[in-house]
Amino acid sequence: MAKLTPFAWIAAVAAGILSLAGHQVSAAAVDGSELPFPPVPSASKAGPTLQTSVHHRRAQPNHLAKDAPNVLIILIDDVGYGQASTYGGEINTPNLTRIAQSGISYNAFHNTSICSPTRAALLTGRNHQRVGSGTIAERAVDWDGYTGVIPKTSATVAEVLKNYGYKTAAFGKWHNTPADQTTAMGPFDKWPNGYGFEYFYGFLAGETSQWEPRLAENTSIIEPPNTPGYHLTEDLADHAIGWLKKHQSYTPDKPFFIYFATGGAHGPHHVAPAWTAKYKGKFDDGYEAMRERIIKRQKESGWVPQATELTRRVESMPAWDSIPASERPFQLRLMETFAGFVEHTDAQVGRVIDELERTGKRDNTIIMYIFGDNGASAEGQRGSISELLAQNNIPNTVDQQITALNKLGGLD
């Protein structure tokens, strides 16, 4: 079996957890260089007969103190931190705010511009190309650094914590397996269960429908629930809460590690109309005026330096004043739908945190709420009613936009 070699941040997390727990361990144990731990030798001795044999049930080693903290990593997809009300934005994120107000906020999270590399680096603590993730999993090729497969010699944080006795689970987006290896036949060692997660519920792709997702549970492809009003992000929160309840019932003495990675707010932007309606009229003066408001608030709050200047509008984004009046309702509805989707996503995160509070576990849980894996959603530009149309550079006609106006965000 290959030795697991976690890199700096994972080793630091493990060391910090052990330190917080008041547990004294050797340097080798802290850095994880000898994981998995060697098996405990048996104290039993078999003699010629039962009477001359000695049986002692071996005690399982405890590598953690009783009060070792739980760990919850929350990763939101395709958002920029400047969009959150927490940091001066226009989208309500009360649950991000309550975590920020009770902890420490960082505004220099260094990531890559696409999903898979950022996630591979986050999970392993290594440069994304060092772990085969130089591009998104769907574009994996057999070149060093671009295979789309995290090598087994590079431990994920889940593997490290699992070896120390943590219960581990992942919910939501898993974008670190090449597309041709996500079928019902595996190979399953490239799925989350093969990277230290004892339980997985989510999807194996960069995106999926929130209404009719392609779901996987552990190593099985499953059908989504046929429930009226079903929404994937709500389902992920339901499963995370259910898992926490099982943990509380069966293994309350063991700490847990949860990786909660939502599909929101990556396209397609799917959310119930009630959430979209909350932003009706909020952006009527256009996105350029919105940017000015956000940067002003961020400077006032100290989130960005006073000398910060807005980036220039990219040429592919038309100036708001240049958009014909007949097209503006469509553009505004796109913005309102996205905003509703983001707030809805934050609300589901809040439900998971509520469960930690209900069971009295929040105070002993390290929560890392990462608001954006690679910056804001790039599905903007002129907007589209169909991703396939956008990918083929086929613009929507005004008639198509008007017809689709009240369908945006919905199943149709």
Regions found by a protein language model. Name each.
Residues 1-11:
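Bacterial N-terminal signal peptides that target proteins for export
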Residues 2, 17-18, 22-412:
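Formylglycine-dependent sulfatase
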